[in-house]
Amino acid sequence: MKILVYGNQKFSDYDTFTRAVVVAIDNANGATTDDSRLDIYTAGPYKINQFTAEFVNKTEGFFKQKGIKSRFYRVLKNDVVENFDKYDIDTVVYLSTKNDRSEIFDTVISEAENNNIPVSVYKV
């Protein structure tokens, strides 16, 4: 399964990040034929990239016990928008603060919706 995680500069709640990723994994489970891999693509900003690295490092042993190889990749948001089909994403997670309204016009969310990819938006 492949999950894209990204957000805005002000997002800084690790607990919400963890919940969002776990829900995305649960929802994407069985969506692809290769459930022996968990690829999390992180398109930033820096704090969300850090959260992704921490999450994968902390859960690596658990996933390994389940026979799942977990990895994360840092990607550029613009590259994801331009080459969305190349990434073969199963679900998209957007993390923001409550006063951020940019997801209404976000290009990644629009691209995901155009490709019938589930999108989850979490605001703190």
Where are these regions (language model features)?
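Acidic/glycine-enriched connector segments
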Residues: 12-124
